[in-house]
Amino acid sequence: FLEGGSSASQRSEAPVEPTTETVPEQSEQSEPPEQPEPEQEPEQPAAPERSLHQQNMLDLLETLAVKGRAPKTGYSRDEFGQRWKDIDRNGCDQRNDILARDLTNVEAPKGCKVLSGDLQDPYTGQHIHFVRGQKTSQAVQIDHVVALADAWQKGAQQLSPERREQFANDPMNLLAVDGPANMQKGAGDAATWLPANKGFRCTYVSIQVRVKAEYQLWVTQAEKEAIQRELGRC
């Protein structure tokens, strides 16, 4: 022990002031940055609505068998019976009936035989003045829209002679048209020949579909695709 002193344990220590740390005030939480909106894909244009005619013809086309072209063996015009037979029994042959139906300003003084008239040709879009005569009659010809030879190679061989004759004279399959255009067409189907007049092509292939359905004739794959393309443009 030291005199006049106290032990270290007896010394009182100065109280220690508690320290407080200043906590910085939290600033208001900032809003999260706006996320960029995902880019929207451009809307695809809606497919054009099909007309009732288009849909009906496309549906009818689907009922036709698709096969290859059969050999032309045995074909002749005579296999389709009497030419221009008066099948509706109105007293006029079928050629004159179609001329009277398709021409305007028709002159037929004796009732049946069309002597002249005007044709707005569906195949070329041109106007043709028809005058009957040895050198002029062929300017306007009557076309089988489904050609006889084409029909022969796509099912008509199996038809009865009477049914083939009906086919060859059916007004649904006959059109008054420009002679040279008809000669150019020959026995072509929709895959190999279409009218130069694009405005008539929809009607043209529609007639072919109806006729082939009526007489249970088939189409080739290329022919079917050509018809589908034209119906899609109707």
Q: What are these model-predicted stretches?
A:
Residues 105-135:
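A glycine-rich, hydrophobic loop/mini-helix early in the fold
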Residues 89-91:
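Acidic, glycine-anchored loop motifs typical of Ca2+
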Residues 123, 127-234:
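Domain-level detector of nuclease and nuclease-like folds
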Residues 65-70:
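Short helix-coil boundary/hinge micro-motifs
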Residues 53-60, 94-98, 203, 207, ...:
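Exposed alpha-helical structural elements
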Residues 80-85, 94-116, 159-163:
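N-terminal post-signal-peptidase region of extra-cytosolic proteins
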Residues 75, 113-115, 220-225:
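Short coil/turn segments at secondary-structure boundaries
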Residues 2-64, 234:
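N-terminal low-complexity, Pro/Thr-rich disordered segments
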